[in-house]
């Protein structure tokens, strides 16, 4: 990969500028802060030593949590996840793939827990729908064939580079 001769320059090559906020790091957080500053009319500069989303953002799993996995034991985290899930689906739907999440119950598990799981999700504002195990096998052919229960939740997949790039573009 060739480097642009203009990409790396001495600090002395730049004219002094004034800004309200300096953001260090062009990942999801830095780009999101830059977008938020721009929407609020706050002047900012985003500094990144490489390309956007090349650090931790570019290496994440891309799962857009519904919060369901926290609903039973950590309602506060579950509520925060579904709130942010809905915000991202609203402002960056072009970056979200509607994959859904599937929680299964195996013969050694309690179907009573599945009921508790659904109730906890509902209490946290997360849609959780019990489905027939036969449908779960169609939805996910690699699922354990011995399952006795299944619940669908609004998990998704997000493209971290596309989200970061969109936020940077929105900030300019």
Question: Which residues does each PLM region occupy?
Answer:
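N-terminal Rossmann-fold NAD(P) dinucleotide-binding loop
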Residues: 30-31
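Glycine-rich FAD pyrophosphate-binding loop
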Residues: 38-58
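Glycine-rich Rossmann-fold phosphate-binding loop(s) that bind the pyrophosphate
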Residues: 25-27, 49
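Conserved hydrophobic helix-helix packing surfaces used for dimerization/oligomerization
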Residues: 21-23, 44, 102
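Extreme N-terminal leader/targeting segments of oxidoreductases
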Residues: 1-21, 36-40
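Helical element adjacent to the flavin cofactor pocket in flavoenzyme catalytic cores
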Residues: 151-172
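Anion (oxyanion) recognition and catalysis
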Residues: 38, 122, 172
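Dinucleotide-binding Rossmann-like beta1-alpha1 core, especially the glycine-rich loop
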Residues: 61-139
């Amino acid at each position: 990969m060739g480097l642009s001769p203009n990409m790396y320059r001495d600090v002395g090559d730049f004219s002094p500028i004034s800004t309200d906020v300096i953001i260090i790091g062009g990942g999801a957080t830095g780009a999101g802060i830059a977008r938020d500053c721009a929407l609020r009319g706050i002047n900012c500069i985003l500094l990144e030593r490489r390309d956007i989303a090349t650090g931790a953002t570019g290496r994440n799993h891309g799962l857009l949590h519904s919060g369901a996995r926290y609903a039973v034991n950590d309602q506060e985290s579950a509520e925060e996840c579904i709130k942010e899930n809905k915000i991202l689906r609203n402002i960056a739907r072009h970056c979200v793939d509607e994959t859904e999440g599937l929680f299964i119950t195996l013969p050694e598990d309690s179907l009573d827990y599945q009921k508790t799981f659904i109730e906890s999700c509902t209490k946290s504002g997360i849609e959780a729908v019990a489905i027939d195990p036969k449908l779960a096998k169609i939805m996910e052919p690699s699922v354990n064939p011995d399952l006795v229960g299944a619940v669908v939740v609004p998990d998704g997949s997000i493209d971290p580079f596309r989200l970061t790039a969109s936020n940077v573009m929105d900030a300019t």
